[in-house]
Amino acid sequence: MQQPWKAVALSDLPLREDLKLQHAYGAPQLDVPVCLNVNENPYPPSPALVERIATAVADAARAANRYPDRDFAALRSHLAAYLTHDTGVTVDASSVWAANGSNEVIQQILQAFGGPGRSALAFTPAYPMYDEYCRTTFTRLHTLPRTEDFALDLNQALDSIRAHQPGVVLLTSPNNPTGTALPIDDIRAILDAAPGVVVVDEAYAEFRRHGVPSAVTLLPAYPRLIVTRTLSKAFKFAGGRVGYCACAPAIVEALKLVRLPYHLSAFTQAAACAALVARDEMLSQVEAIKAERDSTVDWLRGLGLTVADSDANFVMFGEFADRHRIWSGLLRRGVLIRESGPPPYLRVSIGTGAEMAAFRAALLDVMALE
């Protein structure tokens, strides 16, 4: 006989009304030979770096009976040094904040600057978690569709800002799922118009093409700008779950008001610091990934497919009358990609050369059956 506590269904619980028809967000996690669906760096850390990270975590374990540094000063210093190196803008530790993935950073931003009676503005197709952040913080989300080539219609964006007066504007550059980057002048114009904070989500910034600037370059002139980044993508540290942002020190103080106590464990801090010390090694395959991306774009276009320009480590391509059939056909051949973006499109993460060869062979096989 099943015990009562195990027999209770979700529908039996006194769940909040707004959650009753919701589904938990998450990409498929399947055991397949070629996994190209969640935009990870396909190259693992070297054995030597694994050992250094393990040593750092072991050192932290010696004080595991104590709470970690709640303001993670060492990690913020390492992140500030990296941003300064990457962008050429001097960033100090007081202008950096971090959490368990940039998901948590953006959620904290919505907790601090959104909430009941306030709104946010995003541009679709956009990262689907923005919906989740707004729902869980009771922030009303306004959306504006991108143009046919997935750019922003700047005039419409400015009109929407004037109409809705959002507390938070969410910009994604490079955008997920399209891969397209925003012109820096468009970001500047939105900053000039926005009454609240402007978030530029740069999770994929390290993959941007040469000559595409980071929004971090705008920070000195715009105290309400927040640029979010992550170690999960280019830094091949997805398992470490560390995201961060650069912003005015006053915004850091605002985020401290909503963070949970000791939200970054001592082990997370130690591992991330070790990874950042080895930043050259962690980022050593970025140029190879960019080259593979560009060749993938050319190859897909050679098949007559529509492919969005990409400054990320993934490519969105279509247009398919039945994208699920293509996705399923690839999966049957051991290749997992993502049904993401507008319905005619699919998204493929850039993997190793061997993984991309498998993807190309599988796609040709599936398309031959159409």
Swiss-Prot record:
Cofactor needs: pyridoxal 5'-phosphate
Pathway per its UniProt entry is: Amino-acid biosynthesis; L-histidine biosynthesis; L-histidine from 5-phospho-alpha-D-ribose 1-diphosphate: step 7/9
Pfam families to which the protein is assigned, alphabetical: Aminotran_1_2 (PF00155)
Task: Identify the EC number(s).
Answer: 2.6.1.9
Q: What InterPro entries does the record tag this protein with?
A: Aminotransferase_I/II_large, HisP_aminotrans, PyrdxlP-dep_Trfase, PyrdxlP-dep_Trfase_major, PyrdxlP-dep_Trfase_small
Please provide the record's keywords in A-Z order.
Amino-acid biosynthesis, Aminotransferase, Histidine biosynthesis, Pyridoxal phosphate, Transferase
Q: Which sequence positions carry the modification called N6-(pyridoxal phosphate)lysine?
A: 233
What are the recorded Gene Ontology BP terms? L-histidine biosynthetic process
GO MF term (any one): histidinol-phosphate transaminase activity
This enzyme catalyses:
L-histidinol phosphate + 2-oxoglutarate = 3-(imidazol-4-yl)-2-oxopropyl phosphate + L-glutamate
Q: What domain of life does the native source organism fall in? A: Bacteria
Q: What class of enzyme is it?
A: transferase
Q: Per its UniProt record, what NCBIfam families does this chain match?
A: hisC, PRK03317.1
How is the subunit organization of this protein annotated in UniProt? Homodimer.
The record's similarity note reads:
Belongs to the class-II pyridoxal-phosphate-dependent aminotransferase family. Histidinol-phosphate aminotransferase subfamily.
Query: What name does UniProt use for this protein?
Result: Histidinol-phosphate aminotransferase 3
Lineage summary: Bacteria, Pseudomonadati, Pseudomonadota, Betaproteobacteria, Burkholderiales
Name the encoding gene, please: hisC3
